[in-house]
């Protein structure tokens, strides 16, 4: 499957924030959407998520036009979303956080338990499975949120600032999890201010500037582009690609 946005435009009070951008994410691919503050990347990301309605342009899941779908309908079609803000239920344990989503599926009670156990094991949450959401570290919270998102077997996951509020020691853990999602043939779209951490794991990246796409390509191509360095990365930026083991 392919998730694609075509010619998205967004204006606020006659000010053009997004000027006809197009973005494409395939299953089994990690795609970055980056840019300096004010470039329009967050607005573009939110249009793809379904939080903001474009003035023109369309969003497709394969050949299905989902531009007017509310977020819950996009979720039903296999598009998961993880917000930057904490979304775990603070007073529920990790177990109950995951079960709360599984209970909305068509799985039987027994199948829900099996799925929960599988996700807890996969994301290394066994030792804290009974801990409440408000007692988790940033990295533990992110792992729980991603595990809960996978409870509905999404085809795509849209990650808003996945490295925000995460200790440096946990960044590689999150990167490894995102790589695992790719191996499950899930398409990933990431927007984040942490450029190095994002470019280290993306297959391709769209770099926005002043409402448009300045450059799109593999991270190595972006880093070598003089305009990209001048307006965003800086002349001393060095790409550190990661080969993550899991």
Question: What are the language-model segments listed below?
Answer:
Residues 110-128, 175-179:
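Conserved ABC ATPase "signature" region
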Residues 153:
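Conserved catalytic motifs of ABC-family nucleotide-binding domains
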């Amino acid at each position: 499957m392919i998730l694609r946005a075509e010619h998205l435009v967004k204006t606020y009070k006659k000010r053009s924030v997004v000027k006809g951008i197009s973005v494409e994410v395939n299953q089994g691919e990690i795609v970055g959407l980056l840019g300096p503050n004010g470039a329009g990347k967050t607005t573009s990301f939110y249009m793809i998520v379904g939080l903001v309605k474009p003035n023109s342009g369309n969003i497709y899941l394969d050949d299905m036009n989902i531009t007017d779908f509310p977020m819950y309908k996009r979720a039903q079609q296999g598009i998961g979303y993880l917000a930057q803000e904490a979304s775990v239920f603070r007073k529920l344990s990790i177990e109950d956080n995951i079960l709360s989503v599984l209970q909305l599926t068509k799985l039987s009670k027994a199948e829900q338990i099996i799925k929960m156990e599988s996700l807890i094991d996969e994301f290394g949450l066994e030792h804290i499975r009974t801990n409440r959401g408000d007692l988790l570290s940033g990295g533990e919270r992110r792992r729980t949120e991603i595990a809960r998102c996978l409870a509905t077997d999404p085809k795509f996951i849209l990650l808003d600032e996945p490295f925000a509020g995460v200790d440096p020691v946990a960044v590689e853990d999150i990167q490894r999890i995102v790589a695992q999602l790719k191996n499950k043939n899930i398409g990933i779209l990431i927007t984040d201010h942490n450029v190095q951490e994002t470019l280290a794991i993306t297959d391709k990246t769209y770099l926005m500037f002043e409402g448009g796409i300045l450059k799109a390509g593999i991270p190595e191509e972006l880093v070598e582009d003089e305009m990209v360095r001048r307006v965003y990365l800086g002349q001393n930026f060095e790409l550190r690609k990661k080969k993550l083991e899991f």
